[in-house]
């Protein structure tokens, strides 16, 4: 095991995190909030990151180093990412801060907080920005910004990415990372502007776009998206939750003009079919609960998109929905988004693959029985 190279890569990733902490620091300064929690966090994270990145090492890097680096980096990223929460004084203990940080970077969206609106804007910004960093993968961001492992970066990408198959979009892995994050940034900015046009303030548009892009679900409001009471905002976020649930390699194909090849994706067709069919079933099931103005369809589509993408936003209290709709949402939670997206769960591609393998297995067993 090449520990020196792993520690060096860890140090560079912590330097990226220290740089990312500058953004919420600017938010604090803009809104005239106390910047000390972020100043201390930047100093501590940067110092440890610099010390580790200066370690001398050889270039021997194999898959086992990739998996170990991913595990160590996610642990340390979460530990240092919790520092602003701890120094802010709004969390009772560092354990709670660490929980919030892990939830942010892993885009889980669970929180120890019962009310988020009293928190400073800088802290709320950092909570959602952790979603954005963790959604595509912190290490993929590091590779894009600081390519230093040459062709061996593919080991890191494979260890970092949760989908069944990880391949390079172009021959150079670092270039693939830049393409992925370029698409990621472009889609995020597009959502920011769409939400702003729909009437959401700039700050809220940024925070909710980060959470949508990372499919995490942290919000600036206690009632999540339901607090805005805006059909336009709900429709926009519904669309972007689905957009970020699709394999980013397909967007690359679209950019290359290979539209037919992108649309021939079996996983994409299965994903869209599941979304459409689930929305239809839930809409019919909850139709009597809402006015006859299409609200049932809007809320059904929003919650289907929120659950299957594992984002976790809410436009209404779906605990009040009939049991059939709630069970269907739970099933969607297990299916999840497409491979190569920022969404979670077992990935949509595995469902038809498992089904085909099961059919083949049963067919072979029946032949053996005959």
Language-model features: where?
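Membrane-proximal intracellular helices of multi-pass ion channels
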Residues: 1-370
């Amino acid at each position: 095991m090449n520990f020196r190279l792993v520690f060096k890569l860890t140090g560079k990733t912590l330097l990226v995190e220290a740089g990312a902490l500058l953004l919420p620091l600017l938010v604090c300064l803009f809104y005239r909030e106390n910047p000390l929690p972020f100043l201390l966090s930047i100093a501590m994270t940067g110092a440890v990151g610099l010390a580790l990145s200066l370690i001398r090492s050889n270039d021997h890097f194999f898959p086992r180093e990739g998996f170990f680096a991913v595990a160590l980096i996610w642990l340390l990223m979460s530990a240092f990412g919790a520092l602003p929460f701890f120094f802010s004084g709004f969390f009772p203990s560092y354990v709670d801060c660490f929980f919030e940080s892990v939830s942010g970077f892993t885009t889980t969206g669970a929180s120890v907080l019962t009310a988020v609106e009293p928190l400073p804007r800088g802290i709320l910004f950092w909570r959602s920005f952790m979603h954005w960093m963790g959604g595509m993968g912190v290490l993929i961001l590091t590779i894009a910004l600081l390519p230093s492992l040459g062709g061996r970066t593919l080991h890191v990408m494979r260890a970092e990415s949760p989908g069944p198959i990880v391949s390079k979009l172009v021959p150079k892995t670092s270039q693939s990372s830049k393409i992925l994050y370029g698409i990621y940034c472009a889609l995020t900015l597009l959502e920011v502007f769409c939400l702003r046009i729909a009437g959401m303030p700039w700050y809220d548009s940024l925070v909710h776009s980060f959470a949508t892009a990372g499919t995490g679900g942290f919000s600036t409001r206690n009632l999540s998206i339901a607090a805005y009471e805006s059909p336009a905002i709900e429709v926009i976020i519904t669309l972007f939750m689905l957009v970020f649930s699709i394999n980013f390699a397909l967007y690359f194909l679209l950019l290359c003009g290979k539209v037919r090849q992108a649309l021939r994706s079996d996983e994409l067709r299965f994903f869209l079919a599941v979304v459409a069919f689930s929305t239809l079933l839930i809409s019919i099931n909850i139709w009597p609960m809402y006015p006859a103005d299409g609200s049932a369809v809007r809320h059904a589509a929003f919650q289907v998109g929120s659950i299957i993408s594992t984002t976790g936003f809410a436009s209404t209290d779906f605990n009040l929905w009939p049991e059939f709709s709630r069970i269907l949402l739970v099933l969607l939670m297990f299916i999840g988004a497409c491979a190569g997206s920022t969404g979670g769960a077992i990935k949509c591609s595995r469902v038809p693959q498992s089904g085909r393998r099961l059919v083949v297995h049963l067919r072979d067993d029946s032949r053996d029985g005959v």
